[in-house]
From Swiss-Prot:
Residues with PTM Phosphoserine: S24, S105, S133, S144
Entry GO MF terms: microtubule binding; structural constituent of cytoskeleton
Protein name per UniProt: Microtubule-associated protein Jupiter
Species assigned in the record: Drosophila simulans (Fruit fly)
Region (Disordered): 1-33, 76-106, 124-168
Lineage: Eukaryota, Metazoa, Ecdysozoa, Arthropoda, Hexapoda
Biased composition (Polar residues): 1-14, 145-155
Domain of life: Eukaryota
InterPro entries registered for this protein in UniProt: JUPITER
Keyword rRNA-binding attached: no
Keyword flag Protease: no
Residues annotated with Phosphothreonine modification: T35, T92, T96
Biased composition (Basic and acidic residues): 76-87
C-alpha cells in the first residue's frame, strides 16, 4: 500500500489520487472481483423475441387499483356482507309492478261510466290539477245554471220576461 503521509518530510505531496469509482476504490486493500454491469438496453427491439415469464416479476400495479399484481384479473364485484345480512339473511322485499307508461288514458269505445269508476279507483278519489275530468270553466257554468233553477221560485215572472225580451 502506498502512503502519501510522511512525518519526516515536510514537503507537500504532488501525487493526485484517483477519483472515486475509478481504478481501485477498495479502501481495505483487497482486490474486488470484476462483474459486468447489468444494464438493460432499452433501445433494443424485442417484438419477435419469445416472451419472458411475467409471473416471475413481482410487479405491483401503481394507481387506484394497486392491490393486485399485473397479469392478475382485478377483484371487482365482490359482495360485501354486513353483519345484519350475515345474521338474519337477505331482507325480502315485496315485488311492485312497474307503471305502464305506454298505456293510453283516452277511452276509445269504452263505457264512460266504467272509465270514470276506473279513474276514481286509480286516483284514490282525488282530483289535483289537470287530472280532474271537469274543467273549472264548465263547472262554474253548470253551477250558475243550477243556482238559477233553484232561485227561480220567487221572481219567476221577472226572469221569464227578461229572458224572452217581452217586457220592453
Amino acid at each position: 500500500m502506498i502512503s502519501n503521509f510522511d512525518c519526516t518530510d515536510n514537503q507537500a505531496s504532488s501525487k493526485v489520487l484517483r477519483p472515486p469509482g475509478g481504478g481501485s476504490s477498495d479502501i481495505f486493500g483487497s482486490e474486488m472481483p470484476q462483474t459486468p454491469r447489468n444494464v438493460k438496453n432499452r433501445m433494443a427491439s424485442n417484438i419477435f423475441a419469445a416472451e419472458k415469464d411475467n409471473g416471475v416479476k413481482n410487479n405491483v400495479r401503481q394507481g387506484a387499483h394497486r392491490f393486485y399484481f399485473i397479469g392478475d384479473a382485478p377483484r371487482r364485484g365482490q359482495k360485501t356482507v354486513d353483519s345484519h345480512s350475515r345474521l338474519f339473511g337477505e331482507p325480502t322485499r315485496p315485488i311492485t309492478p312497474g307503471k305502464n307508461h305506454m298505456k293510453s288514458s283516452i277511452p276509445f269505445g269504452q263505457n264512460t261510466e266504467a272509465v270514470a269508476a276506473q279513474k276514481l279507483l286509480t286516483t284514490n278519489g282525488h282530483y289535483n290539477g289537470k287530472s280532474g275530468s271537469v274543467s273549472s270553466a264548465s263547472s262554474s257554468v253548470s253551477s250558475s245554471t243550477e243556482n238559477l233553477k233553484m232561485n227561480s221560485g220567487s221572481r219567476s215572472g221577472e226572469k221569464r220576461l227578461a229572458l224572452t225580451g217581452a217586457g220592453k
